[in-house]
Design a protein with these regions (language model features):
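Short cationic amphipathic helices and targeting signals
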Residues: 98-104
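Alpha-helical recognition domains of nuclear gene-regulatory proteins
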Residues: 33, 101, 113-116
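Helix N-cap motif at beta-to-alpha junctions
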Residues: 105-109
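Short glycine-enriched loop/turn motifs at secondary-structure junctions
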Residues: 93-97
Length: 247
């Protein structure tokens, strides 16, 4: 416990390494909520964004690119067209969804976050246990979008198609925001329940099961009592804990 507290203090004292030098607004709210608890420490994050990147075609976008446009909300076609006027290489239009990494003191703490994340629609969320027992919970999803627009500065698609892409990206952003809001509300409720970490894991042979699985069992009981209830998107019964060790 002392080691986690020391690691948390060191991490929170570091300057923000991102281009923005600050957390995005929605991630900042979640960070304040979690960092106020001794069992959590937030790491890297992004609210989700729409990007227009000018790359050199080498395939390593993060190292060989210029950001022609970036927004953490919805965008309009005219902004994309204006950004394309500055293009000289291979331009890519992207939507990247919310991602949020949290260091957790105990595995049970990570399981609690995982349960809330999956319930909120972030079904690709997972837990990793690294060297030295460092536990990281990653909130993430797969509703990305990446489309090439130009090659060597030459536009390869129509303006009408760009308008269509912007519409799709905005739909994804709106759904992304709804999921973040569900995650935030669910997290507040879970933390307010104030269940001690050592009571989250069941006893006996079932100990290795995730909290999420046991919540599913209780929910199934309610659903049997009300067979007319339809499953919502976040009620996917196939969702499960993604727990694996880093090499």
């Amino acid at each position: 416990m002392a080691a986690f507290a020391r690691r948390k203090a060191e991490r929170l004292a570091r300057p923000d390494p991102s281009r923005k030098r600050a957390l995005d607004a929605r991630a900042a709210e979640l960070a304040r909520l979690l960092n106020g608890r001794e069992t959590f420490c937030t790491a890297s994050s992004c609210d989700g964004r729409v990007l227009v990147l000018d790359t050199d075609g080498a395939g390593v976008q993060k190292k060989n690119c210029r950001w022609l446009l970036v927004t953490h909300g919805t965008c309009v076609k005219d902004d994309v067209m204006t950004a394309l006027e500055k293009a000289t290489g291979d331009v890519v239009f992207k939507f990247e969804p919310f991602v949020f990494h949290v260091l957790c003191r105990e595995l049970q703490d990570a399981q609690l976050l995982h349960s809330v994340a999956v319930d909120s629609g972030f079904r690709n969320s997972g837990i990793t246990v690294g060297r030295g027992g460092k536990i990281t919970m990653a909130v993430r999803s797969t509703h990305c979008l990446e489309v090439p627009l130009s090659h060597k500065g030459r536009l390869m698609v129509s303006e009408e198609y760009i308008d269509f892409l912007v519409h799709i990206a905005n739909q994804k952003m709106e759904e992304n925001i709804r999921r973040i809001e569900r995650f935030h509300k669910g997290l507040e409720l879970a933390l307010e329940a104030a269940i001690p970490a050592d009571t989250l894991a069941p006893k006996g042979p079932e100990k290795s099961h995730s909290v999420y699985v046991h919540r599913r069992k209780r929910r199934s009981t309610r659903e049997q009592a009300d067979p007319s209830r339809e499953l919502e998107p976040q009620d996917d019964p196939e969702s499960s804990l993604d727990l694996f060790a880093e090499p």
